[in-house]
Curated annotation (Swiss-Prot):
UniProt keyword annotation of DNA-binding present: no
Name of protein: Ion-translocating oxidoreductase complex subunit C
Bias type Low complexity, positions: 484-495, 567-582, 592-619, 629-660, 668-693, 706-731, 744-769
Cofactor info, note text: Binds 2 [4Fe-4S] clusters per subunit.
Predominant localisation class: membrane
Bilayer topology annotation: Peripheral membrane protein
Localization: Cell inner membrane
UniProt family annotation: Belongs to the 4Fe4S bacterial-type ferredoxin family. RnfC subfamily.
Residues the entry annotates as binding [4Fe-4S] cluster 2: C387, C416, C419, C422
Source organism: Erwinia tasmaniensis (strain DSM 17950 / CFBP 7177 / CIP 109463 / NCPPB 4357 / Et1/99)
Length: 804
């Protein structure tokens, strides 16, 4: 008894609410076998022929392709598109595709070469010898999608049902009027359909396979039973004819008695459904190694002279199919892609065949009836009685028409399968399906925008978090750097203190200090001389901006220059004398040497500034200056030269006085030679300054003033010579410390270098003076100047000869 109940339950069929029984009109096309059509002049292949994203293009215009060659590639829901024949890719451009909106999409255009050559195939006879994932990958690479009308990628559907599916349903109902593509396919290729069903069952590891077919297809039922024979792995279930029994949820309810939950999928209840055409395409992809390049299309309608089913290559224009079917267009002729209830009218016949194209309907005007105008809803509830999804079409109509998206969503408009049963029974001729499709599209756009906004928000928040993390990382890095620097500074300070303590404990010899101080003094003197030389060059290159000057202003500027020179000379004289008074007996020799070098540099700069200041006034003065100003300028120049010589001699004698407490004969001799050289240079500088004044233009000089100026110059030169003699004799009297010959040699070399530089400077100053213009020189003044120069030279030579 229990076995009889199980057998009864296994063969039992259920029913769904609603549904209609429209005229079938299938006998127009199911009586002739499948036939092939010649190739069109051009193929148009849309990149997107399925639910999902379009793949990446793998060819370029001008490429030669073979049949079955992939033109695009991708993963997941990005199904590839294959070349329907061999030929050349002519272009890649937008073109109108099979969609109710008639929008243009990106398409590949192929010009066939007529050879129809296949690419290399990869057949697999024993599919049970490979992994199931490999079979799913092959299905994806073949570009197989749902051929029943939805166009969902088959590989993605199989991958989602690899676990938990115990029932596989092969949908052979084909309930919509006029369409006979699956019917004719089962009649002509029943064995291949069953083999594809077995491959799908093997991939899913399904416990049972149910083939649901309506009872209005006796030839197809007979062909399937004949091909099945005595096999028990597949079960053929003949169901009553009722529209829309071919819907996924409706057929699942009929064969299993289970209902797919709202918002869920059939896999949630352990059921997965595939179309008859999809099973045939899977067999071709696995066993034969052929990708999806063609499908069965029904050509029917009273406007077609030769209705039937044909093998149509993907990308074939609809006009090419109708042309070979004897299409006779009438007045206001319409052509529908799909059935009369779920199809849509084509905007043009250039639309290509795609993977979801199952029927081309070209009805006559009498066949479709008159196009009656839409009227107001009378609330008859006939649409609710006919709805197979148990919805409220009337309420959905009001919400869709009023744009109330929230209410439409709340009334489960997403569960509408757009079967058209409500519109078929509506007495007011309201195109309800049109409203529902538009409302679904608007809701989808709103959801997409919300998803993009959420994604943008998440990206913004992620960016903010990343910036905060980077900021915290930088702050931590800076803190670590500060700590490391502080620790390193502390270590360096401690190490320096230890070195100082060790040096103080061990003691440092004075000889090393002397060597270091001598080197530092030489370096400081060299740097000072370089700076002075650069200053001279800069002063020489500066142009004279004032061409004319008032005599009164010239006198004022000369007085200011004399005052500045006097202060500079006093500072230079005071700087070397202060150091010995302030320095303690314990000062290091290095400090004394550095102070002496600094004093010499300052004295030299002061002397150069003094020489430059009196010479500027005569250059800037007009040729109309009086002779008295020239005499005054000469006297000022001689006075500044004398002060500069005294400062140089004082700076030269200070270093030995401070750093030589004990007498050394060799150092004394070197110091004496240095003093004589400096005295000689000072005398030469005095003579040059004395001779510069007469060379300046003095058109009306007075003999008395010239004599006075000469006497003053002789007296100053005599004082300079006496000062030089005194400085030369003082050096040997100073006690010299015990020093080694190396230091003496270094000191002598330094003295010779300084003397040489001073001589060169004196020669340069002497040669520059004659170059000055003296257009109105007096012979008497020239004679007086020559006598003064000879007297000064004689006085300078006498002390030096006595010392030698």
């Amino acid at each position: 008894m229990l076995n009889l109940l199980n057998l009864f339950k296994k063969d039992r069929l259920w029913d769904f609410d609603g549904g209609i029984h429209p005229p079938e009109m299938k006998t127009q096309s199911n009586g002739t076998p499948l036939r092939h059509l010649p190739l069109p002049a051009q193929f148009v292949l849309p990149l997107k022929q399925h639910i999902g994203h379009e793949g990446e293009i793998g060819v370029r215009p001008g490429d030669q392709v073979l049949r079955g060659q992939p033109l695009t590639f991708g993963t997941g829901r990005m199904l590839p598109v294959h070349a329907p024949t061999s030929g050349t890719v002519s272009k890649i451009a937008p073109h109108m595709t099979a969609h109710p909106s008639a929008l243009a999409e990106m398409c590949l255009f192929i010009l066939p070469d007529g050879e129809d050559r296949w690419c290399e195939k990869r057949p697999l006879e024993d599919y049970r010898s490979v992994e199931r994932s490999e079979l799913v990958a092959r299905v994806h690479q073949a570009g197989v999608a749902g051929l029943g009308g939805a166009g969902f990628p088959t590989a993605s559907k199989l991958k989602g049902g690899l676990h938990g599916v115990n029932t596989l349903i092969i949908n052979a109902a084909e309930c919509e009027p006029y369409i006979t593509a699956d019917d004719r396919l089962m009649q002509d290729h029943a064995a291949e359909v069953l083999e594809g069903s077995r491959i799908l069952a093997w991939i899913l590891q399904a416990e049972r396979v149910l083939i649901g077919i309506e009872d209005n297809k006796p030839e197809a039922i007979a062909a399937l039973k004949k091909a099945l024979g005595s096999a028990t792995d597949l079960h053929i279930r003949v169901i009553p004819t009722k529209y829309p029994s071919g819907g996924a949820k409706q057929l699942t309810k009929i064969l299993t008695g289970k209902e797919v939950p709202h918002g869920g999928r059939s896999t949630d209840i352990g059921v997965l459904m595939q179309n008859v055409g999809t099973a045939f395409a899977v067999k071709r992809a696995i066993i034969d190694g052929e990708p999806l390049t063609e499908r069965v299309v029904t050509l029917t309608g009273e406007s077609v002279a030769q209705p039937g089913n044909v093998w149509a290559r993907l990308g074939t224009p609809i006009s090419h199919l109708l042309q070979h079917a004897g299409f006779i267009p009438g007045a206001e002729q319409m052509v529908v892609m799909g059935g009369p209830l779920m199809g849509f009218t084509l905007p043009t016949l250039d639309v290509p065949v795609v993977k979801i194209t199952n029927c081309i309907l070209a009805p006559a005007a009498s066949e479709m009836g008159q196009n009656e105008a839409e009227q107001g809803c009378i609330r008859c509830s006939a649409c609710a009685d006919a709805c197979p999804a148990a919805l409220l079409p009337q309420q959905l109509y009001w919400y869709s028409r009023g744009g109330d998206h929230d209410k439409a969503r709340a009334h489960n408009i997403a569960d509408c399968i757009e079967c058209g049963a409500c519109a078929y029974v509506c007495p007011s001729n309201i195109p309800l399906v049109q409203y529902y499709r538009q409302e679904k599209a608007e809701i989808q756009a709103i959801d997409l925008e919300a998803e993009r906004a959420a994604l943008a928000k998440n990206r913004f928040e992620a960016r903010q978090q990343r910036l905060e993390r980077e900021k915290a990382a930088r702050s931590a890095k800076h803190q670590q750097a500060k700590r490391s620097v502080a620790s390193s500074d502390a270590g360096a300070i401690a190490a320096a203190r230890e070195r100082v303590a060790a040096r103080q404990a061990e003691g440092v010899s004075p000889e090393n200090h002397a060597d270091n101080s001598l080197q530092a003094a030489v370096q400081a003197q060299h740097e000072a001389e370089v700076r002075v030389h650069q200053a001279d060059l800069q002063a020489a290159n500066e142009p004279v901006t004032r061409q004319t000057l008032d005599p009164r202003k010239a006198a004022v500027e000369a007085a200011i220059a004399r005052t500045k020179a006097k202060k500079a000379a006093q500072a230079a004289e005071a700087s070397p004398t202060e150091a010995p008074q302030q320095s303690a007996p314990e000062d290091e020799p290095r400090k004394a040497a550095v102070a002496a070098a600094v004093a010499r540099t300052k004295a030299k700069k002061a002397a150069q500034a003094a020489e430059a200041s009196p010479t500027e006034a005569p250059q800037q003065s007009a040729p109309e200056d009086v002779p008295r100003k020239a005499a005054v300028a000469a006297a000022v120049a001689r006075a500044k030269a004398k002060k500069a010589a005294q400062a140089a001699e004082a700076s030269a004698t200070e270093a030995p006085q401070q750093s030589a407490p004990e007498h050394d004969p060799r150092k004394a001799a070197v110091a004496a030679a240095v003093a004589r050289a400096k005295a000689k240079k000072a005398a030469q500088a005095a003579e040059a300054s004395a001779t510069e004044a007469p060379l300046q233009p003095a058109p009306e000089d007075d003999p008395r003033k010239a004599a006075v100026a000469a006497a003053v110059a002789r007296a100053k030169a005599k004082k300079a010579a006496q000062a030089a003699e005194a400085s030369a004799t003082e050096a040997p009297l100073q006690p010299a410390p015990e020093d080694d010959p190396r230091k003496a040699a270094v000191a002598a070399a330094v003295a010779r270098a300084k003397a040489k530089k001073a001589a060169q400077a004196a020669e340069a100053s002497a040669t520059e003076a004659p170059l000055q213009p003296a257009p109105e020189d007096d012979p008497r003044k020239a004679a007086i100047a020559a006598a003064i120069a000879r007297a000064k030279a004689r006085k300078t030579q006498q002390p030096s000869m006595q010392e030698d």
